[in-house]
């Protein structure tokens, strides 16, 4: 899979301990709108999340999309898009480095939407499926980006790549 971008905040010391996380995220486009997860905090993100121990990337992608959106991925439509690499000081350990690989896949889903299976924090943020015009999603995220959440910066980068792709 091709590397799309490196996000390195350089806000850590090289001798810090590092923690690596691997995640899969879905790019689902329907009628020139992209499927995103909407939060009541005001941001939009790609559906997806962490890969569990022993799980393949594809299995993680299918599971995460179902859990966060209720959409069922058509496995035979899954295509690699690319991945991002993030490196920054950990939010949970002052002397830790957080490294994340986010693997993006283009895929299609069945029309039927079933019940979400959300974590407590996702319930608190009222995660819901939203098919968004890319410019609208970028605009909403730009307002939220005041807090400089790295996942918003990462997902906005991907949204801009998709915008160029579907022109």
Give the role of each language-model region.
Residues 1-25, 31:
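Acidic, metal-coordinating catalytic segment for phosphate/diphosphate chemistry
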Residues 28, 106-108, 131-133:
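Short, well-ordered beta-strand micro-motif
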Residues 29-68, 72:
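Conserved Nudix-box catalytic region and its N-terminal flanking loop in Nudix hydrolases
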Residues 43-44, 114-167:
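Nudix hydrolase/Nudix homology domain
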Residues 72-83:
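A short coil-to-beta-strand element that immediately follows conserved catalytic motifs
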Residues 86-116:
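Active-site-adjacent beta-strand/loop module that shapes the phosphate/pyrophosphate-binding cleft
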């Amino acid at each position: 899979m091709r590397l799309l971008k490196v996000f390195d905040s350089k806000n850590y010391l090289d001798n810090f301990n590092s923690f690596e996380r691997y995640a899969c995220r879905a790019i689902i486009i329907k009628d020139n709108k992209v499927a995103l997860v909407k939060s009541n905090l005001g941001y939009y993100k790609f559906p997806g999340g962490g890969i569990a121990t022993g799980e393949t990337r594809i299995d993680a992608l299918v599971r995460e999309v179902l859990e966060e959106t209720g959409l069922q991925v058509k496995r035979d439509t899954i295509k690699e898009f690319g991945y991002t690499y993030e490196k920054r000081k950990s939010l949970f350990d002052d002397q830790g480095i957080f490294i994340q690989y986010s693997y993006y896949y283009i895929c299609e889903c069945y029309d039927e939407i079933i019940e979400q299976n959300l974590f407590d924090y996702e319930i608190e943020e009222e995660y819901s499926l939203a098919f968004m015009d890319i410019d609208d999603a970028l605009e909403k995220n730009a307002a939220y980006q005041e807090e400089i959440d790295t996942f918003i910066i990462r997902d906005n980068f991907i949204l801009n790549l998709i915008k160029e792709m579907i022109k």
